[in-house]
From Swiss-Prot:
The keyword Amino-acid biosynthesis applies. Tetramer of two alpha and two beta chains. The alpha subunit is responsible for the aldol cleavage of indoleglycerol phosphate to indole and glyceraldehyde 3-phosphate. The gene is trpA. Belongs to the TrpA family. Disulfide bonds: none annotated. The active site is at E49, D60. Pathway: Amino-acid biosynthesis; L-tryptophan biosynthesis; L-tryptophan from chorismate: step 5/5. It comes from Geotalea uraniireducens (strain Rf4). Its EC number is 4.2.1.20. It comes from the Bacteria. This is Tryptophan synthase alpha chain. It catalyses: (1S,2R)-1-C-(indol-3-yl)glycerol 3-phosphate + L-serine = D-glyceraldehyde 3-phosphate + L-tryptophan + H2O. Transmembrane segments: none annotated. PANTHER family: TRYPTOPHAN SYNTHASE ALPHA CHAIN, CHLOROPLASTIC, TRYPTOPHAN SYNTHASE, ALPHA CHAIN.
Length: 267
């Protein structure tokens, strides 16, 4: 059983939901990212998504776009991120998911990327611009190496798309709660709750909800109906204001509060 599957199974046994946290790898630098991964885990994160910075992040709002720019300016590359994962994997067993765009993976070479990612200790990959209809080659390579491939569903996904993602994906399914780009929002769309119910009729994989969740109350509301919640932009926003120990402490405190919000709802 993969680290991702094991984590969700263990949480289910404890009647808990998953807190999935997102930060951009290399913002402000890769050395800091390694320390923050350990801080996120210590503070209550159950899974961690590492954003792979890209020069044309079409699905991302301004907060994560700026974070990607800072990481790219610091010299962050996909090979360096894999080296980071290999280093941090010696210190933790928390599931690590690379989230980004297909172009850097394609340029790296699909077979080579998958092999190197698994060797480094990556558990899953989510490529936001690789739809299931075009993912056959990547999915086949990932399946051979035991790498989970995570796909997105959105409020506009019809029943056929839901079935396709349910059949093709592994690890978990990521439901994007709003149309548009990433970014913290002041409330959770009411449509999330019936949408999640509809998706659950067709999927057996864990279902996590992200995009726009920005505080413990929102996280708790969504966790009440999903298997997990993803918080990204609200965390990445802290990187604009803080550095060093203060960034680590602020990030840790916020994640602890988010986890408390998620745990408050139970299973």
């Amino acid at each position: 059983m993969s680290r991702i599957a094991t984590t969700f199974a263990n949480l289910a046994k404890q009647n808990e939901k998953a807190l999935v946290t997102f930060i951009t790898a290399g913002d402000p630098d890769l050395e800091t990212t390694e320390k923050l991964i350990l801080e996120l885990e210590k503070s209550g994160a159950d899974l961690i998504e590492l954003g792979v910075p890209f020069s044309d992040p079409m699905a991302d709002g301004p907060t994560i776009q700026l974070s990607s720019e800072r990481a790219l300016c610091a010299g962050t590359t996909l090979p360096k991120i894999l080296t980071l994962v290999k280093s941090v994997r010696q210190q933790t067993e928390i599931p690590l998911i690379l989230m980004g765009y297909y172009n850097p993976v394609f340029l790296y070479g699909i077979e080579r990327f998958v092999a190197d990612a698994v060797s480094a200790g990556v558990d899953g990959v989510l490529l936001v611009d690789l739809p299931p209809e075009e993912a056959e080659e990547f999915k086949a390579a990932a399946d051979r190496e035991g790498l989970d491939v995570i796909f997105l569903l959105t409020p506009t996904s019809d029943e056929a798309r839901i079935r396709k993602v349910a059949n093709l994906g592994s690890g978990f399914i990521y439901y994007v709660s709003v149309t548009g780009v990433t970014g913290a929002r002041t409330s959770v769309a009411d449509t999330v709750f019936p949408d999640v119910k509809k998706i659950r009729e067709h999927v057996t994989l864990p279902l996590v909800v992200g995009f726009g969740i920005s505080d413990p109350v929102q996280a708790g509301r969504v966790a009440a109906v999903a298997d997990g919640v993803v918080v990204g932009s609200a965390l990445v926003k802290l990187f604009e204001e803080f550095r060093g120990d203060e960034l680590r402490e602020r990030l840790g405190g916020f994640v602890a509060a988010l986890k408390a919000g998620v745990k408050a709802v139970g299973g």
